[in-house]
Each structure stands twice: as C-alpha cells, then as structure tokens.
C-alpha cells in the first residue's frame, strides 16, 4: 500500500466544519478523525484508522490506494466518488447502508467488516475478498461477483440468476443464501 516511513500523521482532528475540497493528501495517515464532507478531495496512498465518516459527503472524491481500518462509515455513498484509479481496502469497518452502486471495486478487500444493508447493485466486485464479513440485507443485483471469495462471510442473500457468480467461492453450508428467492427450507 504505502511506505510507512514517509507517512504524515494527522490525529484527533474534527474536520466537521472544515472545508477540504480541492485539497490533495498523499501518504497521510488519519487517526481518530471525524469527517462530514470530503467532496472534491484527493487521497492517494492514505490510511484512515479509527475515523468516523458516517454519512460523509464524498462527491467527486478521489481514492487511490486508500485503506480504512476500524472506521465507522454508515451511509456513505461511494458511488459519488471519482471512478478513475478507485482502489480501497476495508478492515474492521462498519459499512452499514453504504452505497457502492455501479462502482468498480474489483480486487477490493473487505476484512472483518459489518456491511448490513449495503447496496452493491451493478458493482464490479470481481476477484474481491469478503473475509469474515456480515452481509445481512446487503443488495447484490446485476453485480459482477466472479471470483469473489465468500467462504468466511455470513448472512448474505445472492440470487445467482441475477448476478455473475462465475467461480465465486461459497461454503456448502451457506447454500441457503443462494436459494433465498425460492423460499425453500434446507435442512
């Protein structure tokens, strides 16, 4: 991701009333910060640790090689970010009700995250990893899930007829999550 020796650290700052638009941050580690509007801001090789971005406005925000660790990001609309170079990684984050509609997220990583009610409609998640994630109520519709590994995640409901699931990985014990639309009982 980035070379930690050259990273600038910004900690314990509440950016709630600060205008960050048109600013660029490269190799910055934000720790325990709060953000409400980062529209038009560019982040390259940055890390957000323990930050609160819930309901933050991120319109036209650039995120290239950005990682989020232990962040609260409820209701964030990633569909509004710039598409070019979009590359993110999430670990131990709360991503409930986030929107990834039409987002290109191939090879992204979601590790130990709670992603309840998130919208992945028409997103490209090919070759992504969902490691130990709770996907209760997450919406997958016309989503590219080819090569995605769901083997350690739970509570998902995915219709194979409405999504590309070619070479996606599931545990046999989770097959019920693929058959939800049929309203059948599996024992």
What are these regions (language model features)?
Residues 1-187:
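Tandem repeat scaffolds
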């Amino acid at each position: 991701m980035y070379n930690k020796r050259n990273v600038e650290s910004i900690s314990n700052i509440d950016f709630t009333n600060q205008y960050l638009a048109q600013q660029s941050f490269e190799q910055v580690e934000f720790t325990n910060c709060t953000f409400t509007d980062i529209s038009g801001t560019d982040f390259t090789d940055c890390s957000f640790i323990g930050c609160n971005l819930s309901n933050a406005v991120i319109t036209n925000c650039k995120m290239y090689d950005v990682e989020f660790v232990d962040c609260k990001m409820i209701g964030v609309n990633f569909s509004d970010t710039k598409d070019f170079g979009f590359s993110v990684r999430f670990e131990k984050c709360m991503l409930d009700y986030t929107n990834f509609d039409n987002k290109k997220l191939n090879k992204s990583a979601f590790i130990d995250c709670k992603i309840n009610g998130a919208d992945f409609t028409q997103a490209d998640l090919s070759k992504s990893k969902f490691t130990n994630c709770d996907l209760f109520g997450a919406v997958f519709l016309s989503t590219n899930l080819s090569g995605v590994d769901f083997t350690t995640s739970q509570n998902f409901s995915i219709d194979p007829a409405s999504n590309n699931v070619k070479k996606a990985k599931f545990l046999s014990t989770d097959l019920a999550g693929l058959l939800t639309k049929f309203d059948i009982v599996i024992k």
